[in-house]
């Protein structure tokens, strides 16, 4: 028979594929806030894009927000920041448990800039 076992075909495909098997296309892009930015308001918007089926978690020292992206993968949430530097961790968690993390530092100031 000239038929091949499907698992053998898959093994051959994996061996010759230029794309690593672990690359699921899962990503996280944060549009706002920019890293090391200054804010003159206590409330800032965290927004970006990821895969539509991910769960996005926005963490600061005082809060955590869980956000579901739109069908296009867009997400946005408002968080309250404290005086001085604020360390913000944005994580996208895929259904398979894969995690992408982006960190931002945003400083709150009442001074004109």
Where are each of the predicted segments found?
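Ser/Thr-rich low-complexity repeats and stalk/linker segments
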Residues: 1-113
